[in-house]
């Protein structure tokens, strides 16, 4: 076999095994890792996407949308969206927590404010991770505070 043919086969094999995008039609909930659950939650917060927030907000039993009244869950998520809306986020670390939790520490910035907070994640069904609690006190001044340096937005 010629070098050209081998090189062509290697190229085709590399293309075929490249990164693949997994599309979520809404039936897949949780995330593959604790950090990804937090990242997905924060992305949904900034997009004001309550449905997306609900896919990674849950407990060891799965997404909260399966166990909490829809109206009640939406109220909770809207409140969380106010507190956790941010301009930038940076993961600081991840540690083992108590009662099978993983704690993901994140630095959030909003306007001229910078706060460190902790998200508590837990593994649910199908080995998927869910954000089930967070340190809201650390970002209490993010919600409704005109002093965050964000004007006209």
Name each model-derived stretch.
Residues 1-7:
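Bacterial N-terminal signal peptides that target proteins for export
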Residues 27-29, 35-40, 47-101, 109-112:
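Short solvent-exposed beta->alpha transition segments
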Residues 17-21:
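Short, charge-rich, low-complexity alpha-helical interaction segments
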Residues 81-83, 89-153:
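Exposed beta-sheet edge and beta->alpha loop/turn motif
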Residues 13-14:
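C-terminal motif of bacterial Sec signal peptides marking the signal peptidase cleavage site
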Residues 5, 30-32, 43, 73, ...:
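Alpha-helical interaction segments
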